[in-house]
Amino acid sequence: MPRALWTAWVWAVIILSTEGASDQASSLSCDPTGVCDGHSRSLNSIPSGLTAGVKSLDLSNNEITYVSNRDLQRCVNLKTLRLGANEIHTVEEDSFFHLRNLEYLDLSYNRLSNLSSSWFRSLYVLKFLNLLGNLYKTLGETSLFSHLPNLRTLKVGNSNSFTEIHEKDFTGLTFLEELEISAQNLQIYVPKSLKSIQNISHLILHLKQPVLLVDILVDIVSSLDCLELRDTNLHTFHFSEASISEMSTSVKKLIFRNVQFTDESFVEVVKLFNYVSGILEVEFDDCTHDGIGDFRALSLDRIRHLGNVETLTIRKLHIPQFFLFQDLSSIYPLTGKVKRVTIENSKVFLVPCLLSQHLKSLEYLDLSENLMSEETLKNSACKDAWPFLQTLVLRQNRLKSLEKXGELLLTLENLNSLDISKNNFLSMPETCQWPGKMKQLNLSSTRIHSLTQCLPQTLEILDVSNNNLDSFSLILPQLKELYISRNKLKTLPDASFLPVLXVMRISRNIINTFSKEQLDSFQQLKTLEAGGNNFICSCDFLSFTQGQQALGRVLVDWPDDYHCDSPSHVRGQRVQDARLSLSECHRAAVVSAACCALFLLLLLMGVLCHRFHGLWYMKMMWAWLQAKRKPRKAPRRDICYDAFVSYSERDSYWVENLMVQELEQFNPPFKLCLHKRDFIPGKWIIDNIIDSIEKSHKTIFVLSENFVKSEWCKYELDFSHFRLFDENNDAAILILLEPIDKKAIPQRFCKLRKIMNTKTYLEWPVDETQQEGFWLNLRAAIRS
C-alpha cells in the first residue's frame, strides 16, 4: 500500500510539472519577426523551448528567481533581453555565454547581491546594460565591464545598499552616452574611479547627500557634457574653488531634479557656474528652495555674473516660505548674459520691471502655467524691458483680454513670436494693436468662436487649433503656416485669402470633402493634415483621392487618418480602401439606361397590346368589373325587352322598316330595344349598352360588312360576349343580312365564333317567297 501511494505521488508530480511547463510555454507569445512577450505572466522560470528564432525576449515583471546556463543557450540570435522586476537572486556563470548578438540587457530591480564579470565576457556588441535596483554593495571584485567595448548606456547602483565606488569599477569603458549611478547612501568614492571614462555625454547621479559630489566632479568635469543630479539634499553643499579652478572643463549643462536648496547652498551652486566656465544651460526640475531669497548677507554680491550660462529652465519650483520670499534684487546683476529663460508651473504672477530691464540679452521667455494677468504683465513688460526679446510664451496663465494684452506688449519692439494659448479670451475684438514685427501667434485652446481683423497682417505662422471656429475668412497675405485643427470648420479656407500658405493642419473638424481644384488653388501648399474628419465618400471624392499618386506627399497623415462617415455601407473604412458600386458612381447613366429600357418595355408592351388586343381586354375588364357590381343576372321581372337589336347605322332602314314592323306589329307583339329609340339620353353610352343587354331576353346581331366596321357595334358584340361567358347562356341570335366571311369576326370573340360554327344562324333571303319563313324562324328564336 505505501508503495502504491508513493507511485501515485510521483506520477502526480510529473503530470503537474508537465502542465506547468505547458502553461509557461503557452503564456509566451511570439510574432513572426521573433519578438516574444512574456511580460507580467506570473512566470517563475524562463520558459523552455526557446530557439534561435527568438530575437527579442521580454520576461519583465514576473517571479523568476534563477537563470541557468541552459535557459538561453539556443537563443544565439537574441538581441534584446528584459529580465527586470523579477526575483532573480542567482545567475549562473555562463548563462549569457551564447548570446553573442545581444545588444540590450535589463537585469534591474531583482535580488542580485553579487555581480560577476563572467556574465558579460562574450557580450561584445552589448550597447545597453541596466543593473539598477539590486542588492549588491559594490560592483564586484574585478572589473565588470572590461569586455564591453561597445557599451553606450550603463545603469548601476541602488537606493540602499550600494555604498562604494572603486577605481577598477569602470575600467575598460571609454565612451558612454548615458551613465546612471544610483548611490543615495554612497559612503566611499575612491578618487579617479570615473576618470578612466574618457567621455560621458550624460551622467545621472542619485546622491542623498553632497559630501562626495565635489570629488566626483573633479574626476568628470573634463570628460562630461551633461550632469544631472537627482534626489539630493544640498543644504550642506559647499563648493571649493581650489578643487577645479585650474582644470579644463567640458560640462555644458547642469540639471537639478528633485533637489533641495537653501539660500546658502544656492549661492554655492552659483559659484560653481563661474568656475565651471563651459556651462551654458542650467535646469531646475521639481526642486525645493528652503529659504526666503535673502542673498545680500552672503557672498553673492561678489559674483558678477552666472558664468557663461545662456539658458535657465525652472519647472515646478516649490518655495515653502513663498510669502516671506524677498524681491531677488540681489541677483538682478547676474542675469545680463542669459538669453533663454523658462519658468514653468511655479506660481509666478509677476516679473518685476527692474528684473525685466536687467535681462538685456534675453531672447526667449517662457512663463507657462503660472499666474500672470494683464495687471501684472503691465509691470513686467515695462519700458526698456526685455529689449531683445523675440519669443514670449504665456501659455495657460490668467489672461482674459486679447486687446489689452496686445497693447501691453507694444514695448517689446523685437517680439516676433507670441504664445498665449490656453487662456480664456472667449472672444476677439474687431481691432487690436501688436508689436510691429509679429510673425508667429499661438491662440490655441482659448475658446474663441470667430476670427476678426484683430490679428496682425504680418503673421507668418498662426495656431488657432482647439477652439470653436466654424469658418475662416481672414486675408493674411504673409501667412505660411496655419494650424486650425479641432474646430468646427465645414470646408477648407479660401485659397485667395492665404496666397503663400505652405503648411495647413486642419484635422478633426467637420469637413466632409475637398476637391482637387481646392488643393490646386493653394499654389504653394506642401503639407496638409486633414485627417480625423467625417468624410462623405462620394464617387468624385474617392476618384480624386484614390487616383492621385502624389497625394501622399502632401497629406502627411494619409491614409490612416482618413475614414468614411457615409454612405453607411462604407462607414469606418479608410478612404483609400472604400469602394462604391457602379450605380452609385454613374447614377445619370444608370437612370438614362433604365429610362431607355422602360421606354423599350413600354413600346414592346404597346406593340403586344396592339397585336393581341390588350387595350380591348383592359377596356372590357373595366366594363366587366363595373357590370359585376350589378346583380349577376337580372330577375325575371326586370326583363323589359324581348330582344336588344345590335345593328349598324347603315343597316337602320332594314331594321326600322322591316324588322320592327314584322315583330312589333305581330300579335302578340314583340318588344324590341333599339339604341336610337330606347337609350336614355345623357347616360354613358356603354352603360346604356350594358343595361339594354341585361334587360333584354335575347340579343339580335344584324351582321353585315357595315356591322363589322362599326365601333359601337363592336362594343355591343363585346358586352354580349362577356354575358355569354359570364352567364353561360344562349342569349345571342345572329342574322346575316348579307353574306360575310367568318374571318371578319375578330378572333378574340371566341365564343361567338364558336356559336357561328356550331349553331345555325338566320340568313336574310333575297327571295321574297322565303322571307315569310325567315320571320317565322326569328320569332321562334326570340321565344326560345
Curated annotation (Swiss-Prot):
Domain of life: Eukaryota
The keyword Glycoprotein belongs to this UniProt entry's keyword annotation: yes
Record localization: Membrane; Cytoplasmic vesicle, Phagosome membrane; Membrane raft
Stretches of the chain found on the membrane's Extracellular side: 21-587
PTM annotation, UniProt: Ubiquitinated at Lys-754 by PPP1R11, leading to its degradation. Deubiquitinated by USP2. Glycosylation of Asn-442 is critical for secretion of the N-terminal ectodomain of TLR2.
Cytoplasmic side: 609-784
InterPro entries per UniProt: Cys-rich_flank_reg_C (IPR000483), Leu-rich_rpt (IPR001611), Leu-rich_rpt_typical-subtyp (IPR003591), LRR_dom_sf (IPR032675), TIR_dom (IPR000157), Toll-like_receptor (IPR017241), Toll_tir_struct_dom_sf (IPR035897)
GO biological process, one term: inflammatory response
Pfam family, one: TIR
Location in chain, cross-link Glycyl lysine isopeptide (Lys-Gly) (interchain with G-Cter in ubiquitin): K754
SS bond partners: C30-C36, C353-C382, C432-C454
Family the entry assigns: Belongs to the Toll-like receptor family.
Biological function: Cooperates with LY96 to mediate the innate immune response to bacterial lipoproteins and other microbial cell wall components. Cooperates with TLR1 or TLR6 to mediate the innate immune response to bacterial lipoproteins or lipopeptides. Acts via MYD88 and TRAF6, leading to NF-kappa-B activation, cytokine secretion and the inflammatory response. May also promote apoptosis in response to lipoproteins.
Protein name per Swiss-Prot or TrEMBL: Toll-like receptor 2
Taxon lineage: Eukaryota, Metazoa, Chordata, Craniata, Vertebrata
Name of the coding gene: TLR2
